[in-house]
Regions:
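N-terminal intrinsically disordered/low-complexity leader segments
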Residues: 1-9, 201-202
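Helix-turn-helix
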Residues: 9, 13, 17, 21-55, ...
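Amphipathic, non-transmembrane alpha-helical scaffold segments
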Residues: 15, 57, 61, 103, ...
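Hydrophobic alpha-helical connector segments
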Residues: 59, 73-98, 147-154
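Short, basic, alpha-helical segments at the C-terminal edge of helix-turn-helix-like DNA-binding modules
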Residues: 62-68
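Amphipathic alpha-helical packing segments from all-alpha helical-bundle domains
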Residues: 69, 112-140, 148-152, 162-163, ...
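C-terminal peripheral helix-coil segments that are non-catalytic and often amphipathic
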Residues: 90, 129-134, 156, 163-202
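Amphipathic alpha-helical segments used for helix-helix packing
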Residues: 93-115, 163-171
């Protein structure tokens, strides 16, 4: 076996193990020792391929976001936000470890993350905003409402939702429960943005 191929297989094994541990216990709860002991990987092998725990975590987050974007790009999102939310939820159900990695930065304070993680988070946010704007472009907006207004409103409500749920992240609620709350709330927010909350008079 070529050395380069062996190295790639080794890194993939380490990443798979790290995704499981970070995806289960979070950055703070997971340790390199856990990864080594549970998955029968030597610590020397990990530090030969990754500088430290931070770099390993960044690679896991990058993989989670890359896989999410790749999955979502298989579908065409037009004016149906429910279809978009269905596919988001489907991905998170299929890949619970990726789900936890992604939501660990959605529902946490940006200040705790390295610049590299912030860049990955921004890539995730930009991708989702682009889908939102693609849907908006196929709708007839109310008079006086611009694309920029729609985007600003969406961003504001999204940030408020994340801030609100990040407080629950510090409570005794399970992380899976928080993810479920986030996705259900986001679906409602998108519905409110598009169709409002008041029934028009006949």
């Amino acid at each position: 076996m070529k050395k380069s191929l062996k190295t790639e297989i080794t890194k993939e094994k380490i990443l798979n193990a790290a995704v499981e541990e970070f995806g289960t216990h979070g950055y703070e709860g997971a340790t390199v020792n856990q990864i080594c002991q549970k998955h029968n990987i030597s610590k020397g092998l990990i530090y030969h391929n990754f500088e430290n725990k931070d770099e390993l975590y960044v690679c896991c987050v990058d993989e989670a976001v890359t896989e999410f974007i790749s999955y979502m790009q298989e579908y065409e999102f037009t004016s149906d936000f429910k279809f978009y939310m269905q596919k988001r939820c489907a991905f998170f159900e299929i890949h619970p470890y990726y789900s936890h990695l992604i939501f660990s930065f959605i529902l946490s304070d940006d200040e705790k993350f390295s610049q590299k993680v912030k860049e990955i988070k921004n890539r995730f946010d930009v991708f989702n905003r682009n889908i939102y704007m693609r849907v908006i472009d196929r709708l007839t907006l109310r008079s006086g409402v611009s694309r920029e207004d729609a985007l600003q409103y969406y961003t504001l409500l999204q940030n408020m939702l994340n801030s609100y749920l990040s407080m629950d992240n510090k409570s005794d609620k399970g992380f899976a429960s928080l993810i479920d709350s986030h996705e259900k709330s986001l679906e409602k927010i998108l519905d409110f943005i598009l169709y409002g909350i008041a029934k028009e008079n006949d």
